[in-house]
């Protein structure tokens, strides 16, 4: 997208019917390629000209990103997203997480919090998938249908990244250790009140749990709130009586539930954008579409996440 924008800047189209479209969308109009809707073109439409074929990797990248954004719950856990160009990155580390502004007398020194670089590199993971098919199987298929398949690849990448985020909270990121889990034989409302208290001065605004954990949470009588039920039926979003968003992580280890302040707990690090193997894409005539994304997670402030473990029946 950035390369296309440099070649065909949007500023040139102010006051025209094409205002509001980015460079890629304008090129689709130029070559009369429809990628969505009932009247979407077949895949081979991209390859009618060499210039049109050059747009195909960007189409794949956008379709995958749409799938990632559609299902991603990572944003419910991370405080910030950092984009880097390389593979080496160190996050910050606070020597003292005491944030209270103490009263000082005139001329006295103010208390300080020192930030330094983390002791280790943030581990990055490459997640991706290869969509393999013969040219004959795809050439007459509509782009709208291919977008659905590519979106599922994006959804799979987003799900894996969500599990990576939770793994960093549980096991640490190499510089900071994993969170502390309080033990409980059976989950109760009192356990969550203790979590709420242990997080102070941070706020409890997100709870991450696996399928078993979510089911047990929803069985707690205090969580059977009428308004929360209406919100779930109307929007599909789970909200607890404590005001925290429930994040369902299907691959998360059973017997553990994490409570965190999503504004202070995690940093997401992305190395580049969604990558498409465009060389094989053209040379092998769509036999294989390789899509990948590189990302990792780092803990920011250790006190911003706590956990509770329970006995799995």
Name the predicted role of every residue range.
Residues 1-53, 313:
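Intrinsically disordered, low-complexity terminal tails
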Residues 42-127:
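Assembly/oligomerization interface modules of large self-assembling protein complexes
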Residues 99-102, 141-142, 216-218, 298-300:
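Short helix/loop capping segments that flank catalytic or ligand/cofactor-binding pockets
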Residues 114-119, 141-142, 172, 207:
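Hydrophobic alpha-helical bundles in membrane proteins
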Residues 127-201, 313:
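Alpha-helical scaffold segments that mediate packing/assembly in large oligomeric complexes
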Residues 221-313:
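Sequence/fold signature of self-assembling virion shell proteins
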């Amino acid at each position: 997208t950035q390369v296309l924008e440099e070649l065909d800047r949007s500023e040139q189209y102010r006051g025209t019917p094409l205002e509001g479209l980015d460079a890629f969308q304008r090129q689709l109009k130029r070559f009369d390629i429809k990628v969505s809707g009932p009247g979407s073109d077949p895949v081979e439409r991209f390859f009618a000209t060499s210039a049109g074929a050059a747009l195909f990797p960007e189409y794949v990248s956008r379709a995958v990103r749409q799938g990632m954004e559609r299902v991603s719950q990572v944003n419910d856990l991370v405080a910030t997203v950092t984009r880097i160009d390389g593979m080496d990155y160190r996050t910050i580390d606070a020597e003292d997480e005491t944030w209270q502004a103490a009263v000082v007398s005139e001329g006295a020194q103010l208390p300080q919090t020192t930030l330094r670089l983390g002791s280790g590199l943030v581990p990055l993971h490459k997640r991706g998938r290869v969509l393999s098919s013969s040219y004959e199987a795809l050439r007459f298929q509509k782009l709208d249908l291919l977008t659905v398949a590519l979106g599922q690849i994006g959804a799979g990448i987003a799900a894996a990244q969500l599990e990576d985020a939770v793994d960093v909270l549980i096991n640490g990121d190499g510089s900071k250790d994993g969170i502390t889990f309080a033990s409980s034989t059976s989950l109760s409302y009192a356990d969550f009140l203790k979590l709420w208290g242990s997080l102070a001065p941070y706020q409890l605004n997100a709870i991450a749990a696996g399928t078993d954990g979510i089911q047990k949470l929803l069985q707690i009588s205090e969580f059977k709130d009428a308004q929360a039920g209406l919100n779930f039926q109307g929007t599909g979003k789970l909200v607890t009586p404590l005001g925290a968003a429930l994040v369902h992580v299907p691959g998360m280890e059973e017997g553990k539930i994490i409570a965190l302040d999503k504004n202070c707990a995690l940093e997401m690090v992305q190395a580049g954008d969604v990558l498409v193997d465009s060389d094989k894409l053209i040379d092998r005539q769509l036999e294989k579409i390789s899509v990948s994304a590189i990302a990792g997670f780092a803990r920011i402030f250790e006190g911003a996440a706590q956990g509770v473990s329970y006995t799995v029946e």
